[in-house]
Amino acid sequence: MISNLAHVDPSAKIGNNVTIMPFAFVDKNVEIGDDSVIMPYAGLFNGTIIGKRNTIYCNAMIGVEPQDFHYKGEDSKVIIGDDNKIRENVVIARGTYTDGATRIGDGNFIMEKVHICHDVVINNRCVIGIGTIIAGNCFIEDEVIMSNSVVLHQNNRIGTLALIQSGCRVQNKSKGWQR
C-alpha cells in the first residue's frame, strides 16, 4: 500500500507488498524490495537500494549526500540488504565517488539517531546503539554490538563479534572476539 500522501518518484522501483506511509519521500532511482515498510517522514534519496523485509522508521534519511570535501555530485549509492530495522532519525550517507556505496548487510538493527557516514560497510546481524556515529570508510564485520553513543573514527575496522561499550571513542582497529 502506497499512501497518496507520500511522494514516490515515478522512476522508483517498488517491490510487492511494500507499505509507504503518508509523508514519506521516495526519490528517483530508488529501489525498495518486497515486504518492506517505509514509515511517515522517512526519506529515501537518489541511489538508495533496499532489499526485502526492511523497516525504515519515521524521519530516517537514507542516501543523503556525503559530508566529504571529495564529493562533487558523483552518482553513488546506499545499498541495504534484507531484514533490517532502521529506527527513527537515522542518517545514512551514500558513497563519495562514482559507483561508490555505503553498504548495510542483512539482519541489522540500527537504533535511533545513528549517523552512518559515506562509504561505510556494516556486514550482517549487527546492533548499532542509539546516538552512535560511524565516520567515513569504516568496515564493521558480522555480529558486532556497538552500545549507545559510540564514536567510531574514520577508516576503522571492527572485527566479528566485537562488543563496544557505551560512550567509547574508537580510534584504532578492533579485532573482535578472540579465543
What residue ranges belong to the model's regions?
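Structural signal for interior beta-strand "rungs" in well-ordered beta-sheet cores
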Residues: 2-178
